[in-house]
UniProtKB/Swiss-Prot annotation:
Gene3D superfamilies (alphabetical): Leucine-rich Repeat Variant
Location of the protein in the cell: Nucleus
Gene: ipi1
Regions that span the bilayer: none
Region (Disordered): 1-30
Organism: Neosartorya fischeri (strain ATCC 1020 / DSM 3700 / CBS 544.65 / FGSC A1164 / JCM 1740 / NRRL 181 / WB 181) (Aspergillus fischerianus)
Native organism taxonomy: Eukaryota, Fungi, Dikarya, Ascomycota, Pezizomycotina
A Gene Ontology BP annotation from the UniProt entry: rRNA processing
GO cellular component: nucleus; rixosome complex
Subunit annotation: Component of the RIX1 complex, composed of ipi1, rix1/ipi2 and ipi3 in a 1:2:2 stoichiometry. The complex interacts (via rix1) with mdn1 (via its hexameric AAA ATPase ring) and the pre-60S ribosome particles.
InterPro entries: ARM-like, ARM-type_fold, Ipi1_N
Keywords, sorted A to Z: Nucleus, Ribosome biogenesis, rRNA processing
Residue ranges, compositional bias (Basic residues): 1-11
Protein name: Pre-rRNA-processing protein ipi1
């Protein structure tokens, strides 16, 4: 009996709360680990003990490799480091790596889910030399168009901002490269919801930009980018181009065709293939993927395929008033000047 009573007491001991006596500390558990020590040094097995720090080129290459990291913060910080290295470099000095090497890593970030990464990417792109970007416009546009048709509203707005920068840097290359005119205009109409006449009658098909679009700020950015894009594609040529002709006429150089009318139409054309748009002897072609190098070709395509849709959309945007109405006025101004100038003199 004594042994069984002792076992019962030991089992009950685990479920009984011990009474603490005054002046005595609580007993420490059996699995207690003392953490009161302080380490003077921490030794890492793979710690680098190089005396010399890595060079700036090595750091640049390291941060380029981190652009594909899974961490949003790491990608943003790497973009910030690259931007600082671009801005702080001496004038007329080459980049640590050519733009052709950097773009394949940078371009997928246009579709990044993190807004901070996309904002930092735009800052980096603006720090790149403009002359180096002009040769890589066909490589940039597919990612921009993919962003403009993305499901996320924030990514669509960020892609429009990148397109505005690209038109400012290389507007002629953007509108004249393969697919740069028709495909980009289709993306604009898709973002704005101006594609068909039926879409303007139904509120469900109108442009939606989520919570950020409540005040119309994204719509203003898209309309401003559309105005810049149309100005680069079908805008009235600069007056500076006509100054030389005025000077020539004043000197009596351009008056040789009098009294003939439209003499320039019967001269040898300046374009390489003036009748290529007729496609007289060629196979059926993809109009969306073609290159429209002259303003006349771009205006002809715009008038046939997009003019009515843009005019109809501008009327609806003007009726909204506010900042959206003012932004639509800028697009209307460019459009009126282009229509007044026509396909060209």
């Amino acid at each position: 009996m004594g042994s069984s009573t002792k076992k019962k007491k030991e089992k009950k001991k685990d479920f009984q709360k011990t009474k603490l006596k005054v002046g005595k500390t609580k007993a420490k558990p059996d699995n207690f680990t003392d953490t009161s020590f302080r380490a003077k040094t921490i030794t890492l097995n793979q710690q680098s003990l190089h005396i010399t720090a890595p060079s700036s080129d090595a750091q640049f290459t390291h941060h380029v490799s981190l652009l594909s990291s899974k961490s949003d913060t790491q990608r943003r910080d790497s973009l910030a480091h690259l931007t600082t290295s671009f801005v702080s470099r001496p004038v007329d000095s080459p980049l640590p790596q050519p733009v052709s090497v950097l773009l394949p890593t940078l371009l997928p970030l246009i579709l990044d889910a993190s807004s901070s990464v996309r904002t930092q990417l735009l800052k980096l792109l603006r720090a790149l030399p403009a002359n180096d970007i002009q040769d890589h416009v066909p490589q940039l546009l597919p990612y921009i168009r993919a962003g403009m048709t993305h499901l996320a509203a924030d990514i669509r707005v960020s892609a429009v901002e990148v397109l505005s920068w690209l038109v400012y840097v290389a507007g002629a290359e953007v509108v004249s490269c393969a697919g740069g005119w028709i495909k980009t205009l289709n993306c604009f109409l898709s973002v704005l919801g101006w594609h068909t006449e039926e879409s303007s009658k139904w509120s469900g098909n109108r442009a939606s930009f989520g919570k950020s679009g409540a005040k119309g700020q994204p719509m203003v950015k898209v309309l401003a980018a559309l105005a810049v894009f149309l100005q680069a594609g079908i805008g009235r040529p600069d007056d500076g181009m006509g100054d030389s002709s005025d000077e020539d006429s004043a000197m009596g150089v351009s008056g040789w065709e009098f009294p003939l009318c439209h003499a320039a139409q019967h001269m040898v054309p300046q374009a390489t293939a003036p009748f290529v748009h007729l496609n007289l002897f060629g196979q059926p072609r993809d109009e969306e993927g073609e290159m429209y190098e002259t303003r006349e070709d771009r205006y002809r395509v715009f008038e046939n395929r997009f003019l009515r849709a843009v005019q109809r959309g501008l009327e609806g945007a003007r009726s909204e008033g506010g900042e959206v109405g003012r932004a639509s006025a800028g697009v209307s101004k460019v459009l009126k000047e282009a229509i007044a100038y026509g396909p060209g003199a």
